[in-house]
């Protein structure tokens, strides 16, 4: 084996370990792992570092979270039984659409949508209509507004839809200038 091949093999092994290590904390967020495991993944996983500008000693920053093909800046605050995450990116219509698609890929479903001050409560609608009717009404509601209109979409894991205390709450906010993804893991 040539020296170049050996170096390439070692480098690719190191790179793949780094890449998978960066994803471990996000996979832990989505899993049923206890909050302590998530806190440990953030504080010792290597991707996050202590924020220098925060007053709190339990605030961590992430300069570049590759959420599928999107680049997000993140902050995390850790409390006793909760982890708060906030991710930001500049608003672009395609970025908003991709975030929605990626949240769905990760097993999350919309629970409530507010656009330009008007609200559609999916949980409530499901009590009075079939899932197909709710899907149709939701699409009509969303398409009523321009994509850059201020919006907030509440998400939960599909298996926790309708439960009073889900272990994961996600809120996708957009004001036409920035997109914020807030995640609370209990």
How should these model regions be labeled?
Residues 5-14:
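Bacterial N-terminal signal peptides
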Residues 114-158:
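Mixed-charge, low-complexity intrinsically disordered segments
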Residues 11, 140-143, 168:
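Intrinsically disordered, low-complexity boundary segments flanking structured domains
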Residues 17-129, 173-186:
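Short helix/turn-capping signatures at newly exposed starts of structured segments
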Residues 156-171:
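Low-complexity, intrinsically disordered Gly/Pro/Thr-rich segments
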